[in-house]
């Protein structure tokens, strides 16, 4: 079968190669054909810059090779080059784009809530098995919740001695009704853990993450001659519930499977155009702690507040008072957020209730700052109750849900810098942006273990139509963001960049 374009090189050729899809078809003087590397390995290389440095290759070939012999030796001896590796990866990604887009649309149309990712995990497991990975399903144990199944998936591909690298994705979706109008939009409705019927949507891009992981898994399975070590593909459930990473670790993730030297992940973002990636060394995302506070009083008739102790008034003062924690007690060099997201109290206009319940979220980078905020919340609640004459038997109840706590995400600076250089080489310097940290949270941080024993890095993947982002910046009207019913990444450039960047990162960490 004829190849798209064939270049024939004389023995003395040292010049540029035309860009585009090529296969090198070398002929001996007698006319006997030397089959191309495309024929040998089923690959067609894309040469974007169009220059083949035979001088560099000659230095790695046996002494005395001519230009032609050097080229042939390098093609058939498996000598890798950065340009050759990139050309191979580019061609493979382009070949797989139709399949990746189909996978993404299927996942987007069939989201599953946290703790219920049964079909999604089974799909990922099946895809990894088909690629030759050794797959273990149902990894994850949720302490105190025997009714939740562990839907974590671990796929291992061993390739000789070398580092162990984990690539992680999330599996779950959100209770959001999709309003994108896409032809593959989710129409799923189901019951959540509380038994309420809700709509479900991949409103945080985990479908992009899953597809990128599967694409990366395929690229690396086909490029095994260019890396060595143990590659682990990790599909984590219940990220949105901040419980899946801990569940997998509690189920022996690092004892049942090889302990990683590095763990890497990506996350789509509305802050960048599709085709770009972002890196954030050091603190990248905040810790998250949910707090419930019950302010108690003495109920009574709304017409006679003087004989009651009004917890609604307590709550009003408390909400205002805690605004001073960040502004007056926290150092401006230690970012923190205290947000009251829910207040519930009372049933009728003429009844003073016995209690008011508040729900808060705390976000910090440093653990000592988090502990100080928790102490300040207790102190202020007690002080306001005392000022209202609340008896000690009705003191406020302040409860921090440590089971719902997620530590701050700290990207190992050295690993992040290394990946940043890889991305600049693969995507171009203009397509790699250093992003500031944010106060959002997620549980990827747990894979580093305590005291940051394992270097981890989560980088950001641009997912927005460049023109829409430019218009947003001109007009000041934000594009739909994560967790929005309108969140709709641009699939093709986002997936192309996700697979290329993640595969290149692994190849660098596991290079021979």
Predicted region positions:
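Histidine/acidic-residue-rich, glycine-tolerant segments that coordinate divalent metal ions
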Residues: 152-153, 189-201, 207-208, 220-342, ...
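Divalent metal-coordination and catalytic microenvironments
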Residues: 107, 167, 206, 233, ...
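N-terminal secretory signal peptides that target proteins for export/translocation
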Residues: 1-60
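Metal-dependent amide/peptide-bond hydrolase catalytic core
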Residues: 85, 316-512
């Amino acid at each position: 079968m004829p190849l798209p374009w064939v270049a024939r090189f004389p023995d003395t050729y040292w010049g540029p190669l035309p860009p585009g899809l090529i296969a090198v078809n070398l002929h001996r003087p007698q006319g006997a054909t030397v089959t191309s590397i495309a024929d040998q390995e089923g690959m067609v290389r894309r040469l974007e810059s169009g220059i083949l440095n035979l001088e560099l290759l000659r230095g790695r070939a046996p002494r005395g090779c001519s230009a032609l012999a050097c080229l042939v030796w390098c093609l058939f001896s498996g000598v890798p080059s950065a340009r050759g590796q990139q050309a191979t990866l580019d061609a493979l990604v382009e070949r797989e784009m139709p399949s990746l887009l189909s996978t993404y649309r299927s996942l987007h149309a069939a989201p599953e809530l946290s703790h219920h990712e049964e079909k999604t995990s089974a799909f990922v497991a099946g895809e990894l098995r088909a690629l030759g990975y050794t797959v273990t399903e149902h990894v994850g144990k949720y302490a105190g919740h025997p009714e939740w199944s562990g839907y974590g998936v671990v796929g291992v591909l061993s390739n000789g001695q070398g580092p162990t690298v984990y690539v992680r994705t999330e599996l779950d979706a959100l209770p959001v009704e999709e309003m994108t109008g896409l032809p593959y939009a989710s129409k799923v409705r189901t019951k959540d853990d509380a038994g309420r019927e809700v709509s479900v949507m991949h409103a945080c891009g985990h479908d992009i993450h899953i597809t990128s992981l599967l694409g990366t898994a395929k690229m690396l399975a086909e490029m095994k001659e260019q890396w060595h070590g143990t590659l682990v593909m990790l599909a984590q459930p219940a990220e949105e519930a901040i419980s899946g990473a801990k569940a997998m670790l509690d189920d022996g993730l690092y004892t049942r499977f090889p302990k990683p030297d590095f763990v890497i992940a990506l996350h789509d973002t509305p802050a960048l155009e599709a085709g770009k990636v972002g890196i954030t060394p050091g603190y990248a995302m905040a810790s998250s702690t949910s707090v419930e506070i019950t302010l108690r009083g003495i109920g009574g008739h709304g017409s006679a507040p003087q004989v009651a102790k009004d917890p609604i008034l307590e709550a009003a003062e408390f909400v205002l008072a805690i605004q001073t924690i960040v502004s007056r007690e926290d150092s401006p060099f230690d970012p923190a957020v205290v947000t009251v997201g829910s207040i519930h109290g009372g049933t009728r206009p003429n009844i003073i209730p016995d209690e008011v319940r508040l729900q808060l979220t705390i976000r910090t980078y440093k653990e000592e700052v988090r502990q100080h905020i928790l102490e300040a919340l207790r102190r202020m609640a007690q002080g306001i109750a005392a000022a209202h004459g609340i008896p000690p038997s009705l003191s406020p109840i302040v409860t921090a849900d440590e089971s719902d706590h997620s530590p701050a995400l700290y990207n190992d600076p050295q690993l992040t810098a290394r990946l940043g250089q890889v991305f600049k080489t693969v995507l171009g310097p203009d397509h790699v942006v250093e992003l500031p940290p944010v106060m959002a949270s997620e549980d990827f941080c747990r894979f580093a273990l305590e005291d940051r024993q394992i270097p981890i890095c989560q980088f950001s993947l641009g997912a927005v139509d460049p023109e829409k982002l430019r218009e947003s910046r001109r007009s000041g009207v934000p594009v739909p963001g994560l967790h929005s019913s309108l969140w709709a990444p641009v699939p093709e450039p986002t997936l192309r960049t996700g697979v290329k960047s993640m595969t290149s990162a692994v190849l660098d960490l596991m290079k021979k």
